[in-house]
Amino acid sequence: MAKSLIFAHRGANKEAAENTRSAFDKALQYPIDGIETDVQLSRDEIAVLWHDRYLGKAGLPTKHIDDYDYSALQSMNFAAHFSASANPEGIVSLKEFLAAYRKRCHLLIEIKNRDWESASRHQIKVRHTLDLVGAPQGDAIMASSFNLDSLIYAQRYRPGFPLVYNFETDQTYADAQRALAEQSFLHGLCLPIASLNETTVKLLRDHGKSIAVYTCNSDAEINNALELGVDILISDVPQKALQIRAMKTGAA
């Protein structure tokens, strides 16, 4: 069986501000297999890396990322919330991220959709992401979303691109059965670690699908994911996950 791949969640987010170049570069100081990040759109429809609903970490707790054009986001400091001594860092665009990291490790790009956005804006985000990535090259770069409609649209727009359906904590085994039966194009599911069990693993393996899990930080969570043989283990502490994997397999 192939070993589980360790992905840094928004970079090394315990060592630098998440989704910044510093976080990605620090993550790559470890022998990680991949990086997970999040894509949203600026007001002028530039794909940028940002997870949260609001810009509280940039000192703007009532504002969204799409309240600002890309140029304004570049001038903001997205590192100050992590440490007052951190060097200022503006927003990272998806284009910059791909140019810097696509040849260095696997990438899992989560396309974030928000309730206040129109369906057309969701689709713009999908198109921009897939256009910037280009033709799929196996599972070197994958896209994911909690929004199944966005993944269905992505499959129509770029057939064959590896698309992963992210599950919420309240979704069930029956939801997984339904998704796999109705959406056979899915590359796999990304499950909350609390939802991972042998029954769900067997379901996904029987369908020939990939299994990713988030967010595995404790020893128990990491061990559970590794023992069940997930394909992708997403962690805020990738160095710990690497150490535990090495102890289990004899190699990092």
Predicted regions and their residues:
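Phosphate-group recognition and catalysis centered on beta-loop-alpha active-site segments
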Residues: 1-252
